[in-house]
Amino acid sequence: RLQLQESGPGLVKPSETLSLTCIVSGGPIRRTGYYWGWIRQPPGKGLEWIGGVYYTGSIYYNPSLRGRVTISVDTSRNQFSLNLRSMSAADTAMYYCARGNPPPYYDIGTGSDDGIDVWGQGTTVHVSSAPTKAPDVFPIISGCRHPKDNSPVVLACLITGYHPTSVTVTWYMGTQSQPQRTFPEIQRRDSYYMTSSQLSTPLQQWRQGEYKCVVQHTASKSKKEIFRWPESPKAQASSVPTAQPQAEGSLAKATTAPATTRNTGRGGEEKKKEKEKEEQEERETKTPECPSHTQPLGVYLLTPAVQDLWLRDKATFTCFVVGSDLKDAHLTWEVAGKVPTGGVEEGLLERHSNGSQSQHSRLTLPRSLWNAGTSVTCTLNHPSLPPQRLMALREPAAQAPVKLSLNLLASSDPPEAASWLLCEVSGFSPPNILLMWLEDQREVNTSGFAPARPPPQPGSTTFWAWSVLRVPAPPSPQPATYTCVVSHEDSRTLLNASRSLEVSYVTDHGPM
């Protein structure tokens, strides 16, 4: 079985030359009818063909890299190599060597990679002036001394200060690997990377086992194993004083039974003072029990959709909270600083497959209140957290659209093909806008057109938006008239533009 294996540096400095080698095993590189090439994939992008060599000796390069790239074959060692000069940050990518069938070049970016039949595993190459550095690893644990019996204990490894990316994290209980969650890497301002990984385990299981997280950083050839975690609740049980429960997550006053042994002499007084000092430290640092949630709560406020403002003459606000335990969470509303007397709809607590929970509350007001600039506030209340408030306020400097156009992008040629219409609207603020299509005054299903999120206009505080409608070939000689309808929260009327594909006219209207 033919196998390909890339080798080379994982880190290259800007302006230097990247040298990679692909070792071929399981078959001769001289075999006729094949092409040997290099392909790369930058982060977040598609595959990009670099170049390759045909068995006849002909070499082909990507035109965008010509002048920087050299590919050569060493048949005596059964390998082929890549040299890429003048490296820059744009050359950071996963590099693959591959074997393909004729033709000897492929536009991988368009998906025509059917000719590739053998791939290497790939090697990550980073272009940076920062030196290679192994990560620092720190153990973290849930910060509670009295976990609930039915609550999980969350262990975490903070992995930081390494370069280049990336690291591999594996969790073990004893010798058994454990399912874990590793978060996406973040590049710090100093160009070094950081990430974290966490493991959630039942309290009883944590008391019985030994846990470790293993971090491997290929570029620095380092491997770090973190074994030691803070002392378990089982070991602390004998020294824990009786706690008087208070609000969950707040500091509690801890008390112990009075000593029954009479202290005599100076030695007894010193022991008594030491014991009082220990009790004081316990009172200052101990919480009665872990809050039932293990992840921070996130609260979000959605402002009214333009559809509701126009079609229902209502302003609907949705406030929702996400976390791992929301049974004690409560959402409240204020309108202009006062509690509303109606219009509030409470959603049910929802549990999701990833272990998280969500809950929402919806407030509906007359559109006139929102247009008048009335403030709307949603507050998340939870026993273990300070209140979290989010306020929605209509932009005072709103501006209605000033220009609407409807153009034919492509006509049906041949006649049985589809046509495309482009509707553009500009000069409005804020960016919330409703754009819909009508076919002979009937609303077109949203699956038939593609709207775009309004970007800001260059050099202006206003926005513009567009939508493309696919018009299928007419089933009869009588074509339909298509209308683009636009509404904005600051518009007094609906704007519309129409076009008939047969007579090719455009009319721009004000109110419908």
UniProtKB/Swiss-Prot annotation:
Note the InterPro entries from the entry.
Answer: Ig-like_dom, Ig-like_dom_sf, Ig-like_fold, Ig/MHC_CS, Ig_C1-set, Ig_sub, Ig_V-set, IgD_del_linker
Q: Which residue intervals define the domain Ig-like in the entry?
A: 1-97, 135-227, 304-392, 396-502
Q: Does the keyword Secreted apply?
A: yes
* UniProt-listed GO biological process terms: adaptive immune response; monocyte activation; positive regulation of interleukin-1 beta production; positive regulation of interleukin-1 production; positive regulation of tumor necrosis factor production
Polar residues bias locations? 235-247
Q: Where is this region: Disordered?
A: 225-296
Constant (C) domain: region residues? 130-512
Region Variable (V) domain, involved in antigen recognition, annotated ranges = 1-129
Q: List the disulfide bonds.
A: C22-C97, C157-C213, C319-C378, C423-C484
Extract the Pfam families matched here: C1-set, ig, IgD_del_linker, V-set
Quote a single Gene Ontology cellular component term.
Answer: extracellular space
Q: Which regions span the lipid bilayer?
A: none
Using the UniProt annotation, give the residues that carry a glycan (glycosylation sites): S238, T255, T256, T260, T261, N354, N445, N496
List where Basic and acidic residues composition bias occurs: 267-287
Whom does it interact with, and what assembly results?
Immunoglobulins are composed of two identical heavy chains and two identical light chains; disulfide-linked. An IgD molecule contains thus a delta heavy chain combined with either a kappa or a lambda light chains. Kappa light chains are found predominantly on the membrane IgD (mIgD) form and lambda on the secreted IgD (sIgD) form, this fact is poorly understood. Membrane-bound IgD molecules are non-covalently associated with a heterodimer of CD79A and CD79B.
Q: What does this protein do?
A: Immunoglobulins, also known as antibodies, are membrane-bound or secreted glycoproteins produced by B lymphocytes. In the recognition phase of humoral immunity, the membrane-bound immunoglobulins serve as receptors which, upon binding of a specific antigen, trigger the clonal expansion and differentiation of B lymphocytes into immunoglobulins-secreting plasma cells. Secreted immunoglobulins mediate the effector phase of humoral immunity, which results in the elimination of bound antigens.
* Name of the molecule in the record: Immunoglobulin delta heavy chain
Q: What is the lineage of its organism?
A: Eukaryota, Metazoa, Chordata, Craniata, Vertebrata
